[in-house]
Amino acid sequence: MASVTIRYANALADVVLSNRLDVTTAVRDLNNIVSMTIESEDLRKVWENPSIAVAQKRAILDGLVGMVGTPRIIRNFVAVLIDHQRVPLLPRIARQFELELNHRMGFADAEVTSVHELSAQDRQMIEQQIAKVVGKSVRARYKTNATLLGGAIIRVGSTVYDGSIKGQLAKIKEQLSAS
């Protein structure tokens, strides 16, 4: 299913960029539909039920996008997923879509986890350091985890940089065990 997810995400990225839609808005609007789907068990059941007619599913989609003002291109994309019974893949497609847009635009997504909330100055410094390492502009999301003791864990794509005290202690323990 990964290749299907990638194909749909790439196709949507092509359409969004060729129509010069605001990328941030397109990602947000697609994620709004994903959130509605995840939060509503009834809606998930509708998308997954093959006995419900495509026309009914499209009518439900039109009601949803009408409530949140989703652009026609995003609405049409989800309609294609409905037509091909691929709506259950929407959360993965949306994530892949965001990754593809970031790749095409030269951005790297980073997730920074620290023991406490970081100041704006610390965030800027971290983003500059990540940008130097990955050679791209960085869009960072920040979260906290009190179990880290100190330091930070930075995830860029599938690469993890563990600068936490907890991680350092685990490395020391591993080295001592190997000796």
UniProtKB/Swiss-Prot annotation:
The keyword Ion transport applies. InterPro entries: ATP_synth_OSCP/delta_N_sf, ATPase_OSCP/dsu. Keywords: ATP synthesis, Cell inner membrane, Cell membrane, CF(1), Hydrogen ion transport, Ion transport, Membrane, Transport. It comes from the Bacteria. It is found in: Cell inner membrane. It is a peripheral membrane protein. GO terms for molecular function: proton-transporting ATP synthase activity, rotational mechanism. Coiled coil: none annotated. One of its GO terms (cellular component) is plasma membrane. NCBIfam families: ATP_synt_delta. Belongs to the ATPase delta chain family. F(1)F(0) ATP synthase produces ATP from ADP in the presence of a proton or sodium gradient. F-type ATPases consist of two structural domains, F(1) containing the extramembraneous catalytic core and F(0) containing the membrane proton channel, linked together by a central stalk and a peripheral stalk. During catalysis, ATP synthesis in the catalytic domain of F(1) is coupled via a rotary mechanism of the central stalk subunits to proton translocation. This protein is part of the stalk that links CF(0) to CF(1). It either transmits conformational changes from CF(0) to CF(1) or is implicated in proton conduction. F-type ATPases have 2 components, F(1) - the catalytic core - and F(0) - the membrane proton channel. F(1) has five subunits: alpha(3), beta(3), gamma(1), delta(1), epsilon(1). F(0) has three main subunits: a(1), b(2) and c(10-14). The alpha and beta chains form an alternating ring which encloses part of the gamma chain. F(1) is attached to F(0) by a central stalk formed by the gamma and epsilon chains, while a peripheral stalk is formed by the delta and b chains. This is ATP synthase subunit delta. It comes from Koribacter versatilis (strain Ellin345). The lineage of its organism: Bacteria, Pseudomonadati, Acidobacteriota, Terriglobia, Terriglobales. The gene is atpH.
